[in-house]
Amino acid sequence: EDHWSFRRSNYFAHIGNEVRNVTENAGLLDMSAFAKARISGPGAEAFLDHLVANKLPKKVGRVALCHALTERGGVHSEFTIQRESATSFYLVSAGAGQRLDHDWIKKHMPDDGRVRLDNLTNSIGVLVLAGPKARDILAKITRADLSNAAFPWLSGQMIDVNLAPAMAIRVNFVGELGWELHHPIEYQNHIFDALMAAGAEFGLKPFGIRAMDAMRLEKSYRLVGTELSIEYAALESGLHRFVHLNKGDFKGQRQLAEWQERGFANAMVTLEVHDTTDADAIGGNPIMTEDGTVIGRATSGGYGFRLGK
């Protein structure tokens, strides 16, 4: 039972144990709550290319992190997009934002039938296997080649996991070697049990969302609704790698370019806080100078167990 506090509570040590095991061995996280959809049809590529600021993946199986901007140039939604074929794309986004994200897609879809949206959230489960021993564990129960050469970062392949089908995507939100295993939900118990059995000798243990959040903070990975917001320009939020102003027309492009010309008032940075004892920033905290002047706000916060600060 959680004991809520503005200081480090009774779950602090358990989060640390989970982070250390993921970092030293491997961990397994259930992220089936992800919002999942398929965008398909003869107009799918052109539609998505106009909706997001990043370039779409060109090769089948490849993955890109993409952001849908508002008409002002802020960030409305974030999608992991995998190309399935010339006319089909698999989209993954935050579970808490499913209605927001899918409504945004529907709002901008053409009405000529050339683009179709299928909600796959309830039919597909997701297990995240992460840690330095993730490859050794998965290799025990699949025939797929998991080497870097055959299975590079930001790519996905259909594989068998103890004979169950899964789309293995080499991405995760914790900054360790690993795969997201997207599978028909009816196979989830089978895949979970197979992974736990295969990982027993490697120290595999489940970990939770709080441990994931602690690790993503250390990597400066951003979340929609905290670091990414409609209030701030996408480039204020540090999304330069994912926003291509010269790729061609996309929603919010002109407004973002004009905002950039005027100059940004804010910048997203990662701050290290030293000499803390039993309390950490939790997000939403004001950042003030010694005389009490507010100069910013902490979007997220927490203790970095891998860094020890």
Residue positions per predicted region:
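Glycine/proline-enriched, intrinsically flexible loops and inter-domain linkers
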Residues: 1-309
